[in-house]
Design a protein with these regions (language model features):
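Internal maturation/activation junctions in enzymes
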Residues: 16, 66-165, 177-178, 185-186, ...
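Short, small/polar residue-rich loop motifs at catalytic or cofactor-binding pockets
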Residues: 30, 143-146, 168, 217-219
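Active-site rim segments in enzyme catalytic domains, especially the processed small/beta chain
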Residues: 18-19, 158-227, 233
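Glycine-rich phosphate/pyrophosphate-binding beta-alpha loops
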Residues: 44-53, 150, 162-173, 237-244
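Structured, charged N-terminal subsegments at the starts of enzyme catalytic cores
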Residues: 13-87
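Single conserved hydrophobic/aromatic residue that forms the stacking wall/gate
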Residues: 1-12
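Short acidic-glycine loop/turn motifs at beta-strand connectors
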Residues: 38-39, 153-155, 225-229
Length: 248
C-alpha cells in the first residue's frame, strides 16, 4: 500500500480525485459477452461498459442486409457500406451505452432486427448519409498506448485481450518503486451530455461522471465460431474509437 499511497500523492498534486478507498473497494467484474451472428457465424464480443462490441455488431448486422459479394472487396461501394455501417454503429455506442451497473443499456433493442432494418434503410449506395441523420463525433487523435493480443494454444484454449493506458503514458503518473503507469480513463466519461467541445467522447447519459462508475470504452476483444461450435477466429485491436473499424 505504501507505494500506492505515494502514487496517490502525485495524483493529488495534479488535482486528481482518487482515494485509497477507491482502490480497496474495487472489484473486477466478470460479465457475459454479447453475441451476434453474421453469415451463419456466431460473433462473441465485449458488452457494456465497453461500446466497442455494440459498434461492431451493429455494423455487422447492417452489412448482412447487403449482398457484398456483388461488389469487389476494394470497390468504392464496399468501402462506402463499411463506413456507413460503422457510422451507425458508433451512433448506437455514443448515445445509448454506459456502465450497466448504473445505466440500463438497451442491448437487445440496439441489436434487434427492427433497429437494424431501420438503420440499413437509411443507407444510400450512391452518397453519404447527412450528418443530421447519423449524429457524428469529431475525429480524435488516438494514442498508441492500447495493446491487444489474441492467443490459441495447442489444446484449443483461446484468449482475446485488450488493455489500455488511454493516452500516451496514461495520466503521466507512475507509482513510485513499481514502474506502474496510471491510466487516464476518466477522459472517457462524457463531461456534459451532448457537449460539442469534448472531442470524440461518447455523449450517452449513461456515460456521465459518477463515483464508482466505469467509463465507456471502445475495446472489443472478439471470438467467432461456426454454428457447430468450432472456433475459427480470435481477434481484436488497439486504436481507441477506431477499434471496431480495424476488426471489421
Amino acid at each position: 500500500d505504501r507505494p500506492l499511497s505515494r502514487g496517490l500523492g502525485d495524483v493529488y498534486k495534479r488535482q486528481g480525485l482518487f482515494t485509497m478507498k477507491d482502490f480497496e473497494s474495487y472489484e473486477a467484474q466478470i460479465r457475459e459477452p454479447i453475441i451476434g451472428s453474421y453469415r451463419d457465424n456466431l460473433v462473441f464480443t465485449s458488452g457494456p461498459p465497453s461500446g466497442g462490441g455494440i459498434t461492431l455488431l451493429t455494423a455487422l448486422n447492417i452489412l448482412s442486409y447487403f449482398d457484398l459479394a456483388k461488389f469487389k472487396s476494394d470497390s468504392a461501394v464496399t468501402y462506402h457500406l463499411l463506413a456507413e455501417a460503422l457510422r451507425r454503429g458508433h451512433n448506437n455506442r455514443s448515445h445509448f451505452v454506459g456502465d450497466p451497473d448504473y445505466f440500463d443499456v438497451p442491448v437487445s433493442q440496439l441489436l434487434s432486427k427492427e433497429r437494424t432494418k431501420e438503420l440499413a434503410k437509411t443507407i444510400d449506395l450512391k452518397k453519404a448519409t447527412k450528418s443530421t441523420v447519423v449524429k457524428p463525433l469529431e475525429l480524435t487523435t488516438e494514442s498508441r498506448d492500447t495493446t491487444h493480443y489474441s492467443i490459441i494454444d495447442n489444446e484449443g484454449n483461446a484468449v482475446s485481450n485488450t488493455y489500455t493506458l488511454g493516452y500516451s503514458f496514461g495520466s503521466g503518473v507512475t507509482i513510485p518503486g513499481t514502474g506502474i503507469l496510471m491510466n487516464n480513463q476518466m477522459n472517457n466519461f462524457a463531461y456534459r451530455y451532448g457537449d460539442k467541445k469534448e472531442r470524440g467522447r461518447g455523449a450517452s447519459t449513461g456515460n456521465r461522471f459518477e463515483p464508482g462508475k466505469n467509463p465507456m470504452s471502445t475495446m472489443a476483444p472478439t471470438m467467432i465460431f461456426i454454428k457447430e461450435g468450432e472456433l475459427i477466429l480470435v481477434t481484436g485491436s488497439p486504436g481507441g474509437s477506431l477499434i471496431p473499424a480495424a476488426i471489421l
